[in-house]
């Protein structure tokens, strides 16, 4: 189920403040965040956000196509090792 339109999108307040401050100053600094559930707003476009995947921070460069998605979608938490198969001799 998606979030109610009445509530609006969830954007982490601290993350939004940091991005807006960078937009005003014109600096491009990588911002670390643990807020994987935070939605990407149009203000984030052009910035790099380091999203925590449970082990380390994955740098995510935000483009226009990512607006409306959540930050956690672009930082996978699991590594796929491959299915079991026949060992080649």
Swiss-Prot record:
Q: What SUPFAM superfamilies does the record point to?
A: Ribosomal protein S19 (SSF54570)
- What Gene Ontology molecular function terms does this protein carry? rRNA binding; structural constituent of ribosome
- List the signal peptide residues: none
Keywords attached to this Swiss-Prot or TrEMBL record, sorted alphabetically, are:
Ribonucleoprotein, Ribosomal protein, RNA-binding, rRNA-binding
Name the job this protein performs.
Protein S19 forms a complex with S13 that binds strongly to the 16S ribosomal RNA.
**NCBIfam families recorded:** rpsS_bact (TIGR01050)
Sorted alphabetically, which PANTHER family does this protein's record hold?
RIBOSOMAL PROTEIN S19P FAMILY MEMBER, SMALL RIBOSOMAL SUBUNIT PROTEIN US19M
- Report the sequence similarity comment from the record: Belongs to the universal ribosomal protein uS19 family.
Report what the protein is called.
Small ribosomal subunit protein uS19
Organism phylogeny: Bacteria, Pseudomonadati, Bacteroidota, Bacteroidia, Bacteroidales
